[in-house]
């Protein structure tokens, strides 16, 4: 059938375009507001939380590894998330009930690489940058 092409078809074209927009995945996600509700951070880039436990997440095939992660309960809304702890041996800096700063992990609302279901990474532990702890530039404060 094709689209209307004649004179006085602007209203029909405009209405059709308005309806068809909702079949576009990105448009729907941006305009319904449900993606924002589902995001544990809300509209923020980082969030603070309390470490509940240390967990090992098995990497997806064909890799064989246990990725070191922590379960974190966010302070602002009480939601529980799993966050990846980057760098070698950095899991040793963390203990349960520590306060951590968590950021996104690259792809918006998607898991990264071979770590299934993990969408966040730890940036700070006990108000000290994880990178500074790893490089030995700073030490973990005594609690």
From Swiss-Prot:
A single Gene Ontology biological process assigned to it is: cytoplasmic translation
Q: Record keywords: Ribonucleoprotein included?
A: yes
Source species of the chain: Gillichthys mirabilis (Long-jawed mudsucker)
InterPro entries according to UniProt = NA-bd_OB-fold, Ribosomal_uS12, Ribosomal_uS12_euk/arc
Q: Which UniProt keywords apply?
A: Cytoplasm, Endoplasmic reticulum, Ribonucleoprotein, Ribosomal protein
Q: Where in the cell is it found?
A: Cytoplasm, Cytosol; Cytoplasm; Rough endoplasmic reticulum
- Give the protein name, as stated in the record: Small ribosomal subunit protein uS12
Keyword check for Endoplasmic reticulum: yes
What GO cellular component entries does it have? cytosolic small ribosomal subunit; rough endoplasmic reticulum
